[in-house]
């Protein structure tokens, strides 16, 4: 989880002074590739703020916690840096690449993948399309919050504000049709995510000097 969330937030915060120097009319663009728009079922009484408990730690639980916190933290950053920086969390989908055929994978997997690929081709994203989407994310379709925008091609943010500065998008660069985590949002959710994240990062910095 440290590589999927905490270290990425740390990079963003440390690079912010350079990002603020951007002359891009739509602002600088920060793109985090993981699970944008993937919203797992969540207990409203137990919001996934912080890492999952050890007994529940796994691929799905980590995704749940990372996606939830990243959405709210990006919204906070978009507010702080309105007019200057855009924050995008993208789900790239299943991208057909050389990793699946790497000799480091077991032979059975490489054989099985060649069969599975045929059945999953309708769902997969080609490397070319994936690359085109990543380039698109750096354009004015996803501007910093408050940047003067016009036209229906400007994306809606995770709060369903057109050009809102914090975006959760899928493998085609499309946003959700409703507010992210709409039924789970509380008045202090964003603040709780912020305090937790900064507490962890400040604690680590204190340990390392």
Predicted regions and their residues:
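Short, flexible loop/turn elements at secondary-structure junctions
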Residues: 4-5, 34-37, 91-94
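Amphipathic alpha-helical dimer-interface segment in Rossmann-like NAD(P)H-dependent oxidoreductases
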Residues: 3-27, 75-79
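NAD(P)H-dependent oxidoreductase Rossmann-fold/reductase module
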Residues: 45-209
């Amino acid at each position: 989880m440290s590589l999927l969330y905490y270290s990425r937030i740390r990079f963003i915060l440390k690079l912010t002074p350079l990002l603020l120097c951007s002359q891009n009319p739509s602002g600088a663009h920060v793109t985090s590739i993981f699970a944008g728009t993937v919203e797992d079922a969540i207990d409203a009484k137990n919001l996934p703020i912080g890492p999952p408990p050890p007994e529940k730690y796994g691929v799905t639980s980590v995704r749940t916690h990372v996606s939830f916190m990243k959405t709210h933290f990006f919204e906070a950053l978009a507010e702080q840096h309105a007019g200057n920086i855009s924050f995008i969390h993208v789900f790239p989908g299943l991208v057909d690449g050389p990793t699946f055929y790497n000799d480091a994978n077991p032979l059975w997997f490489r054989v099985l993948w060649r069969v599975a690929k045929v059945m999953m081709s309708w769902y997969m994203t080609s490397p070319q399309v994936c690359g085109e989407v990543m380039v698109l994310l750096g354009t004015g379709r996803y501007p910093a919050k408050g940047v003067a925008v016009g036209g229906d091609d400007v994306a809606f943010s995770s709060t369903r504000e057109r050009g809102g500065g914090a975006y959760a998008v899928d493998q085609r660069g499309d946003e959700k049709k409703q507010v992210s985590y709409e039924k789970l949002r509380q008045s202090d959710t964003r603040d709780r995510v912020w305090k937790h994240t900064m507490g962890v990062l400040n604690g680590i910095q204190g340990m390392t000097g």
